[in-house]
Amino acid sequence: MRNNKNQMYIIKIFIALAMITGIIFLCLFYSSLTPSKLKIGAKTSNMDDSPKIKFTLIDQEGKKFDSTHLQGHLSLIYFGTTYSLYDNQALKRVEDIIKILKKENIVVQVVFITLDPQHDTSEVLKKYLEKIDDNFIGLTGRVQDIEQLADQFKVFYTSKIFDVKTNEYELQHSNFVYLISSQGKFLKHYCLGLPKNG
C-alpha cells in the first residue's frame, strides 16, 4: 500500500513537472506508468538498487546539512549558481511545481546546491533564496565536497568565466532537477527545458 502511495506521488510530481515545462500531458502520464519505456525528459532508477546519497554541506543558516536530512520526505535537488539568470528561472519553475503539489497535499523539500561555493556562501544563498522561496534549502561547502556530490549526480559543469559583454560571471552546467525518495535514494531526474549556460 505504501509503495502504491509513493508511486502515485511520483506520478503527480511527474505530471506537475510536465505542466510547468510544457511537455505533452498524456505522453508524460503514459511514461510515468511505464518507466521501462520512459523516454521523455526523465530517467528512472530502481529504488531498491540505488545507493543512498551521502554528503555533508552547509546550509544558508551556516549549519551543517547532511544526507540524513533527505530522509522522511521526498526532495527535489537542483544544482546551479546564484548569479545565473537561467538558474533563477529554473528555481521559479520548481516553486511553481511545489505550489501544484501542495494542492495535492504532497510535501516535497527543495534543495538548491551551488556549483560555485567560493562565491555562493551561506549569506549569499540566504539573501538569494529569500527572493524566491525562503522554504527552499540552499547548500554550499568546500569545493571538493561540492565536486564529489556533483559527481554522484553526474552533473556536468565547466569552470567559471567572466563575460565582458554582460559584465557578469557564467558557469555552464547541465540543467536537471533530481527527485530523491524518502529513504534518501535517487528516483528520477527531469530536464527543465532551459538553456544550459548561465
Swiss-Prot record:
Pfam families: SCO1-SenC. Belongs to the SCO1/2 family. This is SCO2-like protein RF_0043. It comes from Rickettsia felis (strain ATCC VR-1525 / URRWXCal2).
